[in-house]
């Protein structure tokens, strides 16, 4: 009797955890690209090591990007980006925590393309700002989801100072693209 009760208690504890684990999607190789265009110079950087977790049942979503993982065409650009602008030793990550908001009545578990809004807090360079951006989520038949989002980011909004010497080479607003392929964890 005691063994049966112990088994039942264990099963009741583990069953919700198994169900929750089945609902969790994630990746460790998402991609964030940013682009700066000025008459003086175009700058592109890519980070292909973005970690993200998405819970379709609640809409909760999180991203974490190591700043030093952004790669530039020129090594000198990468060095200045990490040391002078982003201070990546002091602020090693950019983090987003928020929620996916499907359009009214849309079911993200249904295969197809879904227009959504993503709302939450973006923390970068020690500054947190609340943002809301449109995004697209494409659900595959196997339950995987491709998520894409384009947004604009102003470095000054996050306390990132651009020295006057290079100000003409860096746009006031950066174009940021997020591309994530979520799979079941």
Name each model-derived stretch.
Residues 1-24:
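Bacterial Sec-dependent N-terminal signal peptides
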């Amino acid at each position: 009797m005691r063994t049966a009760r112990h088994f039942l208690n264990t099963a009741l504890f583990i069953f919700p955890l198994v169900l929750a684990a089945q609902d969790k999607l994630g990746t460790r190789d998402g991609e964030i690209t940013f682009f700066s265009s000025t008459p003086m110079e175009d700058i592109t950087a890519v980070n292909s090591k973005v970690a993200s977790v998405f819970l379709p049942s609640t809409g909760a979503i999180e991203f974490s990007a190591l700043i030093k993982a952004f790669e530039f065409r020129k090594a000198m650009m990468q060095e200045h980006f990490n040391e002078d602008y982003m201070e990546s030793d002091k602020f090693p990550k950019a983090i987003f925590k928020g929620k996916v908001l499907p359009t009214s009545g849309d079911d993200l578990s249904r295969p197809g393309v879904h227009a959504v809004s993503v709302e939450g807090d973006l923390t970068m360079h020690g500054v947190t700002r609340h943002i809301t951006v449109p995004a697209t989520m494409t659900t595959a038949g196997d339950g995987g989801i491709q998520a894409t989002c384009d947004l604009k980011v102003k470095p000054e909004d996050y306390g990132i100072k651009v020295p006057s010497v290079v100000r003409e080479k860096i746009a006031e607003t950066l174009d940021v693209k997020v591309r994530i392929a979520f799979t079941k964890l």
